Amino acid sequence: MGKAKSAAAREDVSMPTAPGVLPGSPVVTLPVDLTINGDQCSFAGTSETDYCTFSYKGEVSAGAMELALSEVKLKNAKLAGMTWKLKPYNQEVEEQDPVRLVWESEKGIPLSGSFEMPVESVLKIALRTPLIAVGAENKVSATDMLGTVLKDVTFMEDGNIVATYKDAANGGTEWTKSPVNLAQYVVENDNQIKVFLNPAAIIAAVNNAGRAVDIQTVIQQAIQMLYPMLVNGVPVAFEQTEDALSVYLNTELLLPLLKTLVFPLLSDEEVVAMLVELMKKDPDFGEMAGLAEPMLKAFPEIIESTTKVEIGLNFVK
């Protein structure tokens, strides 16, 4: 499955522990019997972690160690070896949607006077409204666009998650496979998996934040909340039938994140004004700015009154 070379332990704790080669185990201890041949030692065997079994083989020489892992297999193979295609989108049929979105809250989106629309309804309308320019005259919705960039997802027997996608943002036109060890998974039970992400990609995204006022505080809070998930895995709920799969982040995960990260940002009038101005200047989303402003201003209260929120993707065989 992969190779690893030893390195001195780092004192820099700013970078979270990587997912590791074995899913669910950022650190693995191997009791080995060394075979000595001159200035080199070798070892081989089989072992297991809480989540998988595997074989290993390695060599040790002065100042270096090389370890190769193979035959990695998850103990819980409920999803192993399955490829799921993104659910086709049909604008005329509400159930025929690749996006799973549930949002229940007492507070709605103010539209006119005292009339409020449920936040779930507004978000679904926004996702289905053709706002994204494709070519000179054509526009598509975010939901439509999703189907053009993501084809399917495979849960491999060794715990890797591999997606078939198009890198449309960089002009990609051909379907390609994501690399292994970018995302891994283990099955916790019949309704939950844990997903282990590459922390370097997440840290890079966080470091791209451009505004200084209060952003650093939010980033620090985000890292404090997300760090355990990077090490221990992101809990992801799923519902599986014979021919369908829904994978989503549930209320237990999302609501604390919304209250800690999104609430303080959207309580800042300067941030809201900045977001609205950005939308007004964007040729694709400018026409939504009028709807977005009251929605953004209402969001702190919406978050406070939220009782259920689920966001994810729907797949079919």
Regions found by a protein language model. Name each.
Residues K139-A142, K297-E301:
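Short, P/G- and charge-enriched loop/turn segments at secondary-structure junctions
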